[in-house]
């Protein structure tokens, strides 16, 4: 009886660990999001050449978040981070109408990779504070998310600088990764 209670207690209260890969085109806001989640503040960023990795603690979950640079020359390196990824965060600059097709192409190219077949997808429609930003429904359409029949996905409107929407996204991610486990 005591052992059963101990097992139940540890299952309920043990810290869960999740490996998250955060990608998107350059200047979408990935690094700003990472450090807003990690430190709760805005940091001055420069274009990421390579990656940043941080552990973000949230609601008894330890997210290891890999923020990988999005410049076109280094996107082929994304695949080196796919292994063991449970959740994929794809960050989109909602204000960048010129490159939303490029973002869609990169997203679908990635989702076709075998190593990511079981990863859940969270799209952060970032920069919602800008006046000409596309809303989540428009980005869903432009990214072709409804065509992802075999993939569990969700889109969350965000503003990295204020933190708006970030934790709602993490809630969805943690619930959906936990449900797959």
UniProtKB/Swiss-Prot annotation:
Pfam families: Arf
One Gene Ontology cellular component: Golgi apparatus
Main location: Golgi
N-myristoyl glycine: lipidated positions: 2
One of the GO biological process terms: intracellular protein transport
Gene Ontology molecular function: GTP binding; GTPase activity
Subcellular location(s) per record: Golgi apparatus
UniProt entry keywords in alphabetical sequence: ER-Golgi transport, Golgi apparatus, GTP-binding, Lipoprotein, Myristate, Nucleotide-binding, Protein transport, Transport
Binding site for GTP: 24-31, 67-71, 126-129
Function summary: GTP-binding protein involved in protein trafficking; may modulate vesicle budding and uncoating within the Golgi apparatus.
Protein name: ADP-ribosylation factor 2
The species this protein was found in: Oryza sativa subsp. japonica
Organismal lineage: Eukaryota, Viridiplantae, Streptophyta, Embryophyta, Tracheophyta
């Amino acid at each position: 009886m005591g052992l059963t209670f101990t097992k139940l207690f540890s299952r309920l209260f043990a810290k869960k660990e999740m490996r998250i890969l955060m990608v998107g085109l350059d200047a979408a806001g990935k690094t700003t999001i990472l450090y807003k989640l990690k430190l709760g503040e805005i940091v001055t960023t420069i274009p990421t050449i390579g990656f940043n990795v941080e552990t973000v603690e949230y609601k008894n979950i330890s997210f290891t978040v890999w923020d990988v640079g999005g410049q076109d020359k280094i996107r082929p390196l994304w695949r080196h981070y796919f292994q063991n990824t449970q959740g994929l965060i794809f960050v989109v600059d909602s204000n960048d109408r010129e490159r939303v097709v490029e973002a869609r192409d990169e997203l679908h190219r990635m989702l076709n990779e075998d190593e990511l077949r079981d990863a859940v997808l969270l799209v952060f429609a970032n920069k919602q504070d800008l006046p000409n930003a596309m809303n989540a429904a428009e980005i869903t359409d432009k990214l072709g998310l409804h065509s992802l029949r075999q993939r569990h996905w969700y889109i969350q409107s965000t503003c990295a600088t204020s933190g708006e929407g970030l934790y709602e996204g993490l809630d969805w991610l943690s619930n959906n990764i936990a449900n797959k486990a």
